C-alpha cells in the first residue's frame, strides 16, 4: 500500500492589510507622541521652564533657567512615559484583554513599542552618547564619569533589557497565533513586518516635514522606527514551533473605524507637529 502524502498544514486566515496598516500607524504615532509630549514637553513645563519647539519626533526645552538635575529629569521623562505605556498595555492584556482581534493587536503593538523605546534608548545612548540617556548636557548621564564605562554599561543593559522585552512580547502573542510550526511563524512574521514597514514609512515621511533637515530624520524619526522597533524583523522566530493553536487565531478584520482613526491621526499629527510648533 502506498502511503498517502501528509496533508498540508492549515493556513491561518489573512489579516486585512489596510486595517493592519491603520492600526500600526496609529500605534506608532501614539507611542512617539506620548513619549515626546506627555513625557519631555510636560516635564519641561512642570519643572519650571517651557518648550521652545514641539516636533513630531523631538521636544526642545528652554534649559536656561533649569539646574542640571532638572534637565536630567526632563530627559528621563520620555523613557519613563514609554515604559509606563508598555506596562499598562501588557497588564491590560493579562487582566482585561480586548475581545476583538483588532483591539488586542493594537494594545499589544502599542505596549511593545513603548517597551522597545524605553529599553532601546539605553542601547542607543550607550552606543552614540546622545539621546535621552546620553552624556551630553540634555541627557540623563551628563557628566557621568568615566564616560566610556557608563556608555558600556548602558549598551549592555539596554541590549539585555531589549531582548527581555522581545521575549515578553512574543510570549504574550504566542497563544493567539493560529496554526502550527512554520505556518504560524510565517503568519506572525508577516503581520509584524507589515506593522514595522508602516512605522518606518510614517515616521520618515512625517520626519521629513521638520525644519531642521535630514539630521532630525536620521537621529530621531528613523531611529525611533528603523532602530527602536527593529525587533519586529526577527522576534517571531522565537515563537514556540511545537505549540499548536486552533485556527483562526488572531486575524485582524477589515474595520473602517480603525482605518479612519489611523488615517486621521497620521494626517493631524503630520500637519500639527511635522513642521514643528514654536509656542
Give the ranges of each region predicted by the language model:
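Short, Lys/Arg-rich, polar N-terminal cytosolic tail immediately upstream
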Residues: 1-15
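Metalloprotease/metallohydrolase-associated module, dominated by Zn2+-dependent proteases
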Residues: 53, 61-170, 188-200, 228-234
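Short alpha-helical packing/oligomerization segments
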Residues: 68, 208-231
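Membrane-interface helix-boundary motifs at transmembrane edges
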Residues: 94-104, 174-184, 244-250
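Interfacial loop-to-transmembrane junctions
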Residues: 240-263
Amino acid at each position: 500500500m502506498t502511503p498517502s502524502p501528509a496533508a498540508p498544514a492549515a493556513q491561518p486566515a489573512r489579516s486585512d492589510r489596510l486595517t493592519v496598516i491603520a492600526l500600526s500607524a496609529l500605534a506608532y504615532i501614539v507611542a512617539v507622541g506620548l513619549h515626546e509630549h506627555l513625557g519631555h514637553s510636560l516635564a519641561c513645563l512642570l519643572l519650571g521652564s517651557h518648550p521652545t519647539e514641539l516636533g513630531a519626533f523631538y521636544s526642545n526645552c528652554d534649559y536656561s533657567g533649569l539646574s542640571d538635575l532638572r534637565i536630567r529629569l526632563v530627559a528621563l521623562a520620555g523613557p519613563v512615559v514609554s515604559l509606563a505605556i508598555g506596562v499598562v498595555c501588557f497588564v491590560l492584556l493579562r487582566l482585561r484583554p480586548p475581545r476583538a482581534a483588532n483591539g488586542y493587536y493594537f494594545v499589544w503593538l502599542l505596549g511593545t513599542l513603548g517597551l522597545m523605546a524605553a529599553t532601546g534608548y539605553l542601547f542607543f545612548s550607550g552606543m552614540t552618547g546622545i539621546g535621552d540617556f546620553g552624556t551630553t548636557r540634555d541627557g540623563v548621564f551628563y557628566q557621568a564619569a568615566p564616560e566610556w564605562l557608563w556608555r558600556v554599561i548602558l549598551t549592555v543593559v539596554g541590549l539585555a533589557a531589549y531582548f527581555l522585552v522581545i521575549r515578553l512580547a512574543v510570549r504574550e502573542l504566542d497563544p493567539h497565533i493560529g496554526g502550527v510550526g512554520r505556518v504560524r511563524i510565517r503568519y506572525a512574521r508577516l503581520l509584524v513586518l507589515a506593522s514595522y514597514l508602516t512605522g518606518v514609512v510614517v515616521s520618515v515621511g512625517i520626519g521629513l516635514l521638520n525644519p531642521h533637515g535630514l539630521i532630525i530624520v536620521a537621529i530621531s524619526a528613523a531611529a525611533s522606527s528603523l532602530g527602536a522597533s527593529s525587533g519586529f524583523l526577527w522576534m517571531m522566530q522565537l515563537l514556540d514551533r511545537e505549540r499548536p493553536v486552533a485556527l483562526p487565531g488572531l486575524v485582524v478584520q477589515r474595520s473602517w473605524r480603525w482605518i479612519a482613526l489611523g488615517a486621521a491621526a497620521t494626517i493631524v499629527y503630520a500637519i500639527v507637529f511635522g513642521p514643528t510648533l514654536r509656542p
